[in-house]
Amino acid sequence: MGDPYILMLIALAILATVDLVVGVSNDAVNFLNSAIGSKAIAIRNIMIIASIGVFFGAITSSGMMEVARKGIFNPGMFMFQDIMFIFMAVMITDILLLDVFNTLGMPTSTTVSIVFELLGAAVAISLIKISQNDAESISAIWNYINYEKASLIIFGILLSVVVAFSVGAFVQFVSRLIYSFNFEKRPSYINALFGGFAITAITYFIIIKGMKGTPYYKDVKHLIE
């Protein structure tokens, strides 16, 4: 490995740090916007809760690393320099994209961003490699791209948008029927039931669904299930 790759590794480490700051800022906004806008509690307490949430989310997540490693493309089809170019392009694009969206106050997803950046960079490098090899045609790109896993991930992303919108609209409709605009006149037990259901659903999603695929899940699986 020559000097250019050493410099690229150093650049990747720096870019990863910057990307972490930008990405965490983006995720923190998802915690903060509703809480700050509604003035539910003091901003200081909101920041503490958001920090704890981002911290635990970071240490319990490993699925994204697996996607980056072999979820979108087949690493065996690429040389070391190809992988370096892919990740350099992904890191730079991710920083610029998330920073622009954060600056403009537009919603975005770090997961969706990284998936499509990996796919775009891998396809670009694959096309370059195919163009330099007369024995390969454009159809050979399916050897470079893990299209089954990539298609499943992209379909899941698109489906999650539809499901989230539909379920969210239904829950909002039901909550509006229950509370109308006179929630203070409703019996207190209704608030307790609705709040308990919401907290249970969120906790289930975080613990049961969120921890699956993490290195810690096997240790606590017997306690959960």
What residue spans do the PLM features occupy?
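Alpha-helical transmembrane segments and immediately membrane-proximal extracytoplasmic
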Residues: M1-E225
